[in-house]
Structures are given as structure tokens and as C-alpha cells.
Design a protein with these regions (language model features):
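Tandem repeat scaffolds
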Residues: 3-135
């Protein structure tokens, strides 16, 4: 029961920064609604992490593992997902304008195609252009 209670605790920005500095995994953690703007998550383990409603503007996720993560309604404007694993991630209603998805794995990811055309997202994955800014 104690382990279940731990999962209900939402981490703060400081706690996330401390875990990253220690090189610890953020897999299965809850950081919804947190202000994580401009944080460098390069290579981080964020599998099944709940990042719903989080402010991740200009954050860096290069080569990070976000498989199964929930980014539902998150602010991802200007974020860099170069080489990130977003397989099975939920990006519904996420704000992706200006994000870079170059070579990101978006297999079976739920994409915010009601907000941004799928072609714009795919162009970013294939060419490295920013989402919403055609090359």
C-alpha cells in the first residue's frame, strides 16, 4: 500500500532537477501540471511518466525514452525531441508548435492532429524542421 501512495505524489520542479542531477530514472513518476520549462532531459528515462498539463516549453528531450508517457495537453512549444523514443506516448492536445521531432520514434503515439496537421509533424520527424515551420 505504501508504494501505491508514493505513486500518487506529484513531483515538483526541484525534485525533478534533483533526480536528473543524480542520474536517476523518472520512469512511472507523476509530474503533471509541473513547470518544467527549459529543463534538459537528454537521455533521461521517462517511460510511462505522467507529464499531462506540464509546461515543458523549450525543454530538451534528446535521446530520452518517453515510451508510454502521457504528455496530454502539455505545452511542448520549442521542445527538442531529437532521437527521442515517443512510442505509445499520448500527445493528444499537446502544444507542439516549434518543437523539433527529428528522428523521433512516434510509432503508435497519439498525436495532436486536431491542432497541427500530421504532415507538419512528419516533416519534423523526417527533416528536423520545427513543427509548423515548413522548410
Amino acid at each position: 500500500m505504501a508504494k501505491e501512495m508514493d505513486k500518487l505524489v506529484t513531483l515538483t520542479r526541484k525534485e525533478v532537477l534533483d533526480l536528473l542531477a543524480e542520474g536517476k530514472s523518472l520512469a512511472d513518476t507523476d509530474v503533471r501540471k509541473a513547470n518544467l520549462m527549459k529543463i534538459d532531459f537528454t537521455g533521461a528515462d521517462l517511460r510511462n511518466c505522467n507529464l499531462s498539463y506540464a509546461n515543458l516549453k523549450d525543454a530538451v528531450f534528446k535521446d530520452a525514452d518517453l515510451s508510454g508517457a502521457s504528455l496530454w495537453n502539455a505545452n511542448l512549444e520549442g521542445a527538442d525531441f531529437t532521437g527521442a523514443n515517443l512510442e505509445d506516448a499520448d500527445l493528444d492536445y499537446a502544444k507542439l508548435r516549434g518543437a523539433n521531432l527529428f528522428r523521433a520514434n512516434i510509432r503508435r503515439a497519439s498525436l495532436p492532429t486536431e491542432l497541427i496537421p500530421r504532415e507538419d509533424i512528419m516533416a519534423s520527424v523526417e527533416t528536423g524542421c520545427k513543427v509548423g515551420q515548413k522548410r
